[in-house]
């Protein structure tokens, strides 16, 4: 079975890992970094992903960041003169990760396990699966990020029983999961979270502070200047990271804007104490899901054996202190918070292929599922934190006499009224025989698969007629749209490969011209004019092809030049070798002459007379 890669598709950074033997290994990107910025930019028709895209974010308005926060919505982003869905942008990131994983493995990759925040709803999970499909990946499993982290942490601890709390604060989302580990079973007891809380929010607090201070001093609102705002974002992220290691950092942004008197610069120092003050409300928000998860799991703090920190934002000192204060435990630092989720996803891939044995993952649904009933009430069929996969049925009836059809309004959430919860979909069961209200028996069945994706069935028990749908939210993509996007992605991949081939050829041509010119110069007057003239003629031909830009002609002329340059190089080396041999021979003969002159037979004893 082919390798299944594990992907952590993050808000700010993503990572890809693969199982090698029994160990999960992070695959470094082409720049040598173990995580890749989740940034996509467009320039001159080219799609740029990762570090290169992030570097040009300041100057390139066609740059998309933090697309994960829009997953599962109908919101589109404008770039490159087009509108893209969040699934399409995410697919570009996935395609990039897939590409360098293939380069590392030396084989085609078609399958992946992709992680999502535990608190992602059905629409967001479906959008993630669609993004994988667009990128040419068969998504074998969608795994909750804290669960993946627990897998990576606990794989070598399957012989011991412990309860762990995973605190996952990423770039745009926050999750807390409580798991029980024992005998190779990873059982998620409860999960809670906040999909609108992450490192980006901490950055925004710094940005707002800098904008306010600059406006106070200079009367100019930098938040209205797109380029200045991007520079502020970069500076805020850097300052946040700096303050994890030092107590004060300097923010310096020369020529940030211009005033009536000329250019203006932003120079400001930010202390950790001030940063903690600015972000106090965000840190406080992390405490509620911790308490909620413990309550849902029916556990007290004393029953938690380990606290695992996941996500780059858990490096913020105030966050670490809040975790300590809330749990009464020193967090376990045995895992890398940026890499552990992708590593866990790769382990789950190993479980699917059979390379990892005796490991069972029991995940849960993060939110309750149900339907709207009379009076706009939300009637739950599956409670949150139910182990998945699962199925649950309940019988309902009609609300009016002779009602010919029932509308099934499928919802996800925790509020008592339907209007306050997330609509997943609607469908209708028709042709119900005329009968007084309360008589028809309509059985509604909810199924949640291992990926947390929902399907619903309604069946008239009298006629046995049923209607069945896999939930696709109003914000989801149709199969036709996914198919079109897959073709676009494939075309882009082919175009990217062709572009790379062109660049490689042009670089090769430049290198060949430089090397041949150098060789021709060095061999001037050395006696092999035939080879030099042939190389010069081939060089001139290649230069003409280079000017024309005809790639096929360049390739042919490059091969011809390489042949002539090689012949010239052979002559050079032959001459050098002959000269070296002659020198060595002359040296040997000289040594022999010296030896005969100094032989003992020619030594004459001298007489010495003392006066």
Swiss-Prot record:
Tree of life domain: Bacteria
Keyword ATP-binding: yes
PROSITE patterns: HSP70_1 (PS00297), HSP70_2 (PS00329), HSP70_3 (PS01036)
Annotated SUPFAM superfamilies: Actin-like ATPase domain (SSF53067), Heat shock protein 70kD (HSP70), C-terminal subdomain (SSF100934), Heat shock protein 70kD (HSP70), peptide-binding domain (SSF100920)
Positions of post-translational Phosphothreonine modification: 173
Acidic residues biased stretches: 602-611
Keyword hit for Transcription: no
Alphabetically ordered keywords of this record: ATP-binding, Chaperone, Nucleotide-binding, Phosphoprotein, Stress response
Reported function: Acts as a chaperone.
Family that this chain belongs to: Belongs to the heat shock protein 70 family.
Name of the protein in question: Chaperone protein DnaK
Species of provenance: Streptococcus equi subsp. zooepidemicus (strain H70)
